[in-house]
Amino acid sequence: MQLTHQLDLFPECRVTLLLFKDVKNAGDLRRKAMEGTIDGSLINPTVIVDPFQILVAANKAVHLYKLGKMKTRTLSTEIIFNLSPNNNISEALKKFGISANDTSILIVYIEEGEKQINQEYLISQVEGHQVSLKNLPEIMNITEVKKIYKLSSQEESIGTLLDAIICRMSTKDVL
């Protein structure tokens, strides 16, 4: 149902992904996240192609956190920001964060060392059904993904969609 992954560069950190469908209280969850009463990033799964995309964003967020160079105020927001192909924080939050009308939500949280997130509490806050991450392709909107990342048909013929997305995410600080 969930995916928990230890970060290679930061073995003391674990990233957990929880996917929910048929969510009825996305607006309340968004408000709680903005108030800081929910530990985790609330992500719109329609723009996520693969869990690896999240792991790359989370790894970068932890790296910048450790360096004291995050561009946002919280680790949760930094993960969402790192999914974006550009450096506009508010645009990243609109496109990759959840909105009040969303019916699918991906919750991502990071635990470090002995620090534990109360997963049962987190799950209990969602009025919806937790589903396996294997359902992600059914939820994803390929047209929206291509639009957000400005992917060309030429790029798609050279490599995979995921490769192009990771490339966009990784090079935004360079360009």
Swiss-Prot record:
GO terms for cellular component: cytoplasm; cytosol; EKC/KEOPS complex; nucleus. The keyword Methyltransferase does not apply. InterPro entries: CGI121/TPRKB, CGI121/TPRKB_sf. GO terms for biological process: tRNA threonylcarbamoyladenosine modification. Keywords: Cytoplasm, Disease variant, Epilepsy, Intellectual disability, Nucleus, tRNA processing. Component of the EKC/KEOPS complex composed of at least GON7, TP53RK, TPRKB, OSGEP and LAGE3; the whole complex dimerizes. Interacts with TP53RK/PRPK. Widely expressed. Disulfide bonds: none annotated. The keyword tRNA processing applies. Pfam families: CGI-121. It comes from the Eukaryota. This is EKC/KEOPS complex subunit TPRKB.
